[in-house]
Amino acid sequence: MKCTYNFSAGPAVLPKSVMLRAQSEMLDWHGSGMSVMEMSHRGKHYMSIIEKVESDFRSLFNVPKNYKVLFLQGGAIAQNSMVPLNLLHGKKANYVVSGYWSKRSYQDALPFGDMTIAASSEAIGYAKAPDPKDWKIDSSAAYVHFCSNETIHGVEYFDMPSIKTIPVVADMSSHILSRPVDISQFGVIYAGAQKNIGPAGLTIVIVRDDLLDVASPLTPSVFNWKTQVENQSMINTPTTYSIYMAGLVFEWLIELGGLEVIEKQNIKKAELLYGYIDSTDFYSNPIDIKNRSRMNVPFRIQNEDLHTSFVTGAENLGMIGLKGHRLVGGIRASIYNAMPIEGIQALVDYMKDFEKSH
């Protein structure tokens, strides 16, 4: 079988061992005679799956007991509406804009009430993330929202905000489980699964218990976090197979040694790629060094007419998904947990050869 390295931003690369395990269990899960795809979400087999998935996720991500974990649908985009519906309660909210996705969260929240921008780096092209020390927080606001890793612009927060006055809400879609996080610093964390957790379709939400009682009475039941908690994320049929696949990824991470181990691997991979980009004038990355994402690495070629031929040449060598997002162009390598360092080395070797020939 042809070796392919998938640098797509999402849906993204999955661990090979996870894919092989899913393949072996596809037609008969643990002697049940059924595929997980066929199981009733309320049957004993699937209930055992989802309970273990939550237990493993809590252990892996060190989720405190006073937080609930939800397995929902609609992607992070749905949370752009669910956050104000569940938290605003007639107050205003603060938003930090550090890239396309955090700006989208702000814009999607506007119909629900008074939203203010606490900080923004849009004027500098999102070249760095606004420092939490500079956020203009309104202590009477219902919450402050930010995106801790911007997938398109390649901007990541490494020093998380420590704000005690109001709840902090974080969109962690594209770097969740890439390193340990102190969850007690947050009121809500949410993440689409299709980047660093598993297949598309699943959205994980972590909510502190004290934030479950302030939802707007107009909140649809499927959007109400408390209602979802009371129904074990099953107010409607959940994304059963995506949850099962996420569970296999959690087991893979646990067997690997946990988030401390995967963080070291991610640092090594990012250093290899950024190291080569910085070593030559042929390629460049525009992001402030202290905010360079370990997961999403955008870069450009000095002669921008070469971007298309670079991507095509990479595809011919089995490296796919390198075309930059349509909003910013250029090239982007998404190097999530499941991307082996061999994939990064193959990309760097190709970058060297491409530079020599151009």
Where are the model-predicted features located?
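Active-site phosphate-binding strand-loop segment of PLP-dependent enzymes
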Residues: 10, 109, 120-176
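PLP-dependent enzyme catalytic core of the Aspartate aminotransferase-like
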Residues: 2-4, 316, 329-358
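Conserved active-site segment immediately N-terminal to the catalytic lysine
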Residues: 169, 183-194
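Conserved N-terminal alpha-helix of the aminotransferase class I/II PLP-enzyme fold
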Residues: 33-79, 86, 108
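Active-site C-terminal subdomain of aminotransferase-like
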Residues: 15, 193-274, 288, 357-358
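A glycine-/small-polar-enriched, mobile loop at the entrance of the PLP active site in fold-type I
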Residues: 3-54
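PLP-dependent aminotransferase-like
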Residues: 77-144
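Conserved PLP-binding catalytic core of the aspartate aminotransferase-like
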Residues: 283-314
